[in-house]
Amino acid sequence: YYDSLIEIDLSEMESMIALPFHPSNAYTIHEFVKNADELLAGVEEEAKKKFPKCHFDLRSKVRGGKVYADQGIIAGCAGGMFDSIDEAAAILRDQSTGDGYFSLSVYPTSVPVSLELTKIGVTEELLRAGAVIKPSFCGPCFGAGDVPANNGLSLRHTTRNFPNREGSKPGEGQL
């Protein structure tokens, strides 16, 4: 039994993004897009303090007021859920992830989820859009699997965001 219930209407919530180096360093997507250069400059400054011998260049990912990511990951017990992957497929429907500049990896949260996504055609839609479907396993959230390239900007729908969580070589530009 519970003492009380807190009900939140998620349709009134804005999607958010957490920047390095802590989950609390979060902004609404709208806020991030509007102020990307300034926010990424702040990440670069903090990176210089944490890793003084390294040179990070995230601001180059902002061109003409738009943010260009090198990699996308949908994974883990939060991101790899059926609804998240189904929604990603709906967003990408009849579109492409591009010609090789951007890579998108999708890790369903479990084999039953993966099977259902395949049965209803979601996996096919994602593959046609250019995504790579990976095996279900607990790992992408802590850096096992797709590690970002040096000075690459990786957008991840996962549960973790700590220093060196996704990139293990800060000396080579991985955060």
Spans of features found by a protein language model:
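Fe-S-dependent hydro-lyases/dehydratases of central metabolism
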Residues: 1-175
